[in-house]
Swiss-Prot record:
Protein name according to UniProt: Cytochrome P450 71B6
Gene Ontology cellular component list: endoplasmic reticulum; Golgi apparatus; membrane; mitochondrion; vacuole
UniProt xrefs under CDD domains: CYP71-like
Keyword Nucleus (UniProt): no
Transmembrane segments: 10-30
Gene for this chain: CYP71B6
Keywords from the named record: Heme, Iron, Membrane, Metal-binding, Monooxygenase, Oxidoreductase, Transmembrane, Transmembrane helix
UniProt GO molecular function: heme binding; iron ion binding; monooxygenase activity; oxidoreductase activity, acting on paired donors, with incorporation or reduction of molecular oxygen
Biological process according to GO: indole-containing compound metabolic process
Positions that bind heme: C446
Keyword Heme included in the entry's annotation: yes
Enzyme class: oxidoreductase
Length: 503
């Protein structure tokens, strides 16, 4: 007799089925959530992936117009809830922050972010709290950020002088590429105490490395939506190998910087972030249950580069693009800056607080072009409700910051670039106003927001103070696919010297 045969007579089989069907129905009805947020019908296996397109934040917003501000979609087999209004964002990021402040297990976390040893993709727990405390108190405090002002000034001087040379010859500049080089070089010196030249790389090589990292990070991984077999698809598509190569290139660069610091080979005397982390390592500081290792240091630096550089470049690039498309706003913000600064020849940090209209321009850019259109996903740890709907443990939760910024129930003429909407407005960007979330909010809010905001304000103010800007062609506002909201086409503008003085 076969081990897999059962001696059941055919006469008994119908009765057996009748006995089994009711309890099976009860089981499936009880285990199936009844009160999920509404959403579109899904396909077997694929779920709703076919409805997301290359710009998911736009596709999801369109679905929310039909199904409401909180919707359920399935990414393959993974149940995902997406919120699209300030009210529902507040429920997620404030009211239920403690119930959904962990991260889902994503393939990129293991393959690129040191299996969650950094900050952005780390699971909630003692380790996360320790890393965040370290970042807030040691790496990104106001005092620490201000200690890097001279570096930012030196890098900006190079940028302004380069643009001044282009202005003298009447040639256009690739503003997108130049802004990326500037922010990456500043961040490199802040983290490692060395410039590109000191790192053994030229600008183009480093930017190619960084651009490739952002490209592979921004791609959907089949492993994240088809648990169990998606990794096979990622290997076939080449995503797995491209991630490993990009990670290895950056990891090698970071480790070389650590070794050079130990051997006192860095090119600057200032204390940089590697110095700070190595000092904490020598003091046997613990993160969770482990002492700080070189791997922890590399993981923290990886988060800094991936998040910090990208956010500042995106903001500056979109702001200059929108100003080029809106001459009235460009003239108004330049007038504010030039009237306040006068003939000093440079905008200083002390000037920034008085530049109220410029701050509105930056806010309006963030409203229309959130650097992260959909915030990094959270994962529910317990049962709770959003807008009366049941959220179950293991559900991924996304906040569609782009959709909130264009919500017509919140903003008049939401698709128009009108900085004046922030006159007498109490909307701010630190995470307590859920209408505008450039840095996230709650336990997962960005700890480096002061560094990022200082970079954006100081750079923008000086570019608008020193130069008028002319577009050589119609400025495109088309978005590139990916997790962050890069413009699809480089921004080419002609600088015109106004403050005729090199820095």
């Amino acid at each position: 007799m076969s081990l897999f045969s059962f001696p059941i007579s055919t006469e008994l089989l119908p009765w057996l089925l009748l006995l089994l069907i009711p309890p099976l129905l009860i089981f499936f009805l009880l285990r199936s959530p009844k009160n999920l947020p509404p959403g579109p019908p899904r396909l077997p296996i694929l779920g709703n992936i076919h409805q997301l397109g290359s710009l998911p934040h736009r596709s999801l917003r369109d679905l929310s117009l039909k199904y409401g501000p909180v919707i359920t979609v399935y990414l393959g087999s993974v149940r995902t809830v997406v919120v699209h209004s300030p009210e529902t964002a507040e429920e997620v990021l404030k009211l239920h922050d403690s119930e959904c402040c962990t991260r889902p297990k994503l393939s990129i976390t293991k393959s690129f972010f040191y299996d969650g040893l950094g900050l952005g993709f780390t699971k909630w727990g003692d380790y996360y709290r320790d890393v965040r405390k370290l970042c807030v108190l040691e790496l990104f405090s106001v005092k620490r950020a201000n200690s890097f002002r001279n570096i930012r000034e030196e890098e900006l001087s190079r940028l302004v002088n380069s643009f001044s040379d282009s202005a003298s010859s009447g040639s256009s500049v690739d503003l997108t590429a130049n802004l990326a080089k500037f922010v990456a070089s500043f961040t490199c010196r802040m983290a490692f105490g060395l410039s590109f030249q000191g790192s053994g790389m030229d600008n183009e090589t480093f930017l190619e490395l960084f651009t490739e990292a952002n490209r592979v990070i921004g791609k959907f991984a089949a492993a994240d939506i088809f648990p169990g077999f998606g990794w096979i698809l990622d290997r076939i598509s080449g995503l797995d190998s491209s991630r490993r190569k990009s990670f290895q290139d950056l990891d090698t660069f970071y480790q070389k910087a650590i070794v050079d610091h130990r051997e006192k080979k860095k090119t600057e005397d200032r204390e940089d972030l590697i110095d700070v982390l190595l000092k904490l390592q020598s003091q046997e500081t613990k993160l969770g249950s482990s002492r700080i290792t070189d791997t922890h240091i590399r993981a923290i630096i990886m988060d800094l580069f991936v998040a910090g550089v990208d956010t500042s470049v995106i903001t500056l690039d979109w702001t200059m693009a929108e100003l080029s498309r809106h001459p009235r706003v460009m003239k108004k913000v330049q007038a504010e800056i030039r009237e306040h600064v006068g003939d000093k020849g440079i905008v200083t940090y002390d000037d920034l607080e008085a530049l109220v209209y410029m701050k509105m321009v930056i806010k309006e850019t963030w409203r229309l072009h959130a650097p992260s259109p959909i915030l990094i996903p959270r994962e529910a740890m317990t049962n709770f409700k959003i807008k009366g709907y049941d959220i179950y443990p293991g559900t991924r939760i996304h906040v569609n910051a782009w959709a909130i910024g264009r919500n017509p129930d919140v903003w008049k003429d939401p698709d128009e670039f009108i900085p004046e909407r922030f006159v007498d407005s109490n909307v701010e960007t630190k995470g307590t106003s859920f209408e505008l979330l450039p840095f996230g909010s709650g336990r997962r809010g960005c700890p480096a927001m002061y560094v990022g905001l200082s970079t954006v304000e100081y750079t923008l103010a000086n570019l608008l103070y020193h130069f008028d800007w002319k577009a050589t062609e119609e400025v495109s506002v088309e978005e590139a696919p990916g997790l962050t909201s890069h413009r699809k086409h480089p921004l080419h503008l002609v600088p015109v010297n106004v403050i005729n003085r090199k820095l």
